[in-house]
A protein has these predicted regions:
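SDR active-site strand-loop-helix element
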Residues: 14, 38, 71, 92-98, ...
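NAD(P)H-binding glycine-rich loop region in Rossmannoid oxidoreductase-like domains
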Residues: 43-89, 94, 98-109
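Flexible, glycine-rich beta-alpha linker
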Residues: 137-155
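N-terminal Rossmann NAD(P)H-binding glycine-rich loop of SDR-like oxidoreductase domains
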Residues: 9-31
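Active-site Tyr-X1-5-Lys
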Residues: 112-137, 154
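A short C-terminal helix-loop "cap" of Rossmann-like NAD(P)-dependent dehydrogenase/epimerase domains
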Residues: 157-169
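Mid/C-terminal beta-alpha module of Rossmann-like enzyme folds, strongest
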Residues: 190-251, 267, 273-289
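Substrate-positioning beta->alpha
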Residues: 150-155, 169-192, 199-200
């Protein structure tokens, strides 16, 4: 999917220690690409720049970066755009989320705020790049996972580990397309090297479309367990959630409501333009240390 010779180098990876960043930098190394990394938790080592995109002295500390892969949420990016352009940015790939549409009507205040930040971040990137002649690509993944590291599928595995079973709100018939962070890292690199992806936004679903229940059963299997799924009436599920909420940091009642919603997207434009070909959903939690 990626052709190193088509990348304009050197590359700057922002959010290098993020979930996607942890997979992107080994890929760039394997391709022999010259790159540097920006992270607020960067080690004191060659090729790393410690800082945030909003730091007032960022420009002075950055190396030349004609290509930028922004691998943290897109709302972090706008404060750093001027500094990145000053260091030669010509090509930008940034990550938003399909949540910008799937959670647009959520009654949850936190989710409403996240949707606003995503939408505002996307608009700021488009507007800046249009004025400054920077080719942009915005990637919108579905449900991101990386065994033992994410806050989506791995949280589900943690709940299964604690309870021994998984309660569903209703039958869990809503569609899901979990996508691995490593596939997203490959997509960012491929899009940066693909002129057809200039000035476009893409949805990036995973390699399989499953019901929520099927996805949960795959998680059980990936843990080496027999699936034990318990469908509950939505009202009863909400009551159980309210009692268990202290044990579920970051979870919201809307997660139960969405178990019956179809959150499926079309990845064919990304496949046609830069070879998007994500893996099927077969997580391997039982291989974790």
């Amino acid at each position: 999917m990626s052709d190193a010779s088509a990348l304009t180098t050197p590359v700057l990876v922002t959010g290098a220690t993020s979930l996607i960043g942890q997979f992107a930098t080994p890929r760039l190394e394997a391709m022999g690409v010259e790159f540097s990394r920006l992270s607020r938790t960067a080690p004191d080592a060659p090729g790393w720049v410690r800082g945030r995109l909003g730091d007032p002295d960022l420009e002075a500390r950055l190396p030349a970066c004609p290509t930028v892969l922004s691998l943290s949420p897109i709302w972090h990016l706008p404060p750093g755009l001027d500094a990145l352009k000053a260091k030669g940015m010509q090509r930008l790939v940034a990550f938003s989320s399909t949540s910008v549409s799937t959670k647009a009507a959520s009654p949850d205040a936190y989710e409403q705020g996240m949707v606003r930040r995503l939408a505002d971040g996307e608009e700021a990137v488009r507007a800046f790049c249009a004025v400054n002649g920077v080719a942009w690509t915005i990637l919108r993944p579905t449900l991101i996972y990386a065994e033992g590291q994410d806050q989506n599928v791995s949280r589900l595995a943690g709940l299964i580990r604690r309870l021994g079973f998984l309660p569903l709100a209703g039958q869990g018939g809503g569609l899901r397309q979990p996508v691995h962070a490593d596939d997203l890292a490959a997509a960012a690199i491929a899009a940066a090297a693909c002129p057809a992806a200039d000035n476009r936004a893409y949805d990036l679903p995973g390699g399989e479309t499953l019901t929520y229940r099927q996805m949960a059963e795959r998680v059980f299997e990936g843990m080496g367990r027999r699936p034990a799924v318990l469908p509950l009436p939505e009202g009863l599920w909400r009551l159980a959630f309210a009692l268990a909420r202290p044990l579920l940091p970051g979870a919201t009642a809307q997660m139960g409501a969405r178990m019956s919603e179809n959150l499926a997207f079309d990845g064919s434009p990304a496949a046609a333009d830069f070879g998007w070909n994500p893996r099927p959903f077969r997580p391997k939690f039982n291989l974790l240390p």
